[in-house]
Amino acid sequence: MFPLPTTRDDVYLHAPLFEEKITLDSIFSAISKSGHDVLLLGGKLSAATRKRAADFGLELIDYYCREELQIANAIPTTEGAIALAMQHFPYTLHHSRCTVLGYGRIGKILSHTLHALGANVCVVARKESDFAWIDADGCTPVALGNWEQALTNCQLLFNTVPSMLITEEQMRLLPHDAILIDLASERGIDAQSAQRHGNQVFWALSLPGKVAPATAGCIIKDNVMHILQTAYPPHHTTNSSEITHKN
């Protein structure tokens, strides 16, 4: 089982606490030469890394891309984002004006939790069906093409969309004391533009492992166990109960 992420450059194993660099090819080669039937598990795998493993005749499964893991991870991500906001926001979240960009896994749980804390929440989304869900959850739906009002009144902005949405044009609409928290894997907020306008901006990545490492580990463990139980059903010589007992 490889770490999360398995690699950042498709060449070396991601092992920041280990002094030496370990190439993925050296690992794949050693496993391939062992002659054993091995199931490899990794996280955030690129197509290039999966192809490289296949070149060595190995099966490499991405445990991070499973929908149930992504949904479960959205909970500690939400808690971490709110903790970050509370640390830097000089007011209570109760009655605060929050804007959430995107209504995917994180956007859904984040907007719901902010609303439960008493915040006034606008959610910027694209789909008409999302607007109905946002409204049913007690938040205000805003279309992406008509979101100026959601920016001009915003005190806390949370981005969940991995695409550059907040540029110089949008920054002019935001209050100078608005706090911006970017939760997307690829930046959705122009940090330099935000700093020029005097706004605090935080690119908050890998929050589950930072704010709730035990929970993050359990989420990965549960999904890995499900993969193993699927790959090695009870009729297999290594049954699911043996796998659970060993762990």
Predicted feature residues:
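Rossmann-like adenosine-cofactor binding region
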Residues: 5, 22-39, 134-210
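Phosphate/diphosphate ligand-binding glycine-rich loop within oxidoreductases
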Residues: 10-77
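Residues at the starts of beta-strands that form the adenosine-phosphate
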Residues: 37, 97, 119-120, 200
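Residues in the short beta-alpha loop(s) of Rossmann-like NAD(P)-binding domains
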Residues: 46, 126-127, 184-186
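Adenosine-phosphate binding glycine-rich loop
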Residues: 53-95, 186-247
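Glycine-rich adenosine-cofactor-binding loop
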Residues: 94-115
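NAD(P)-binding Rossmann-fold cofactor-contacting core
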Residues: 117-137
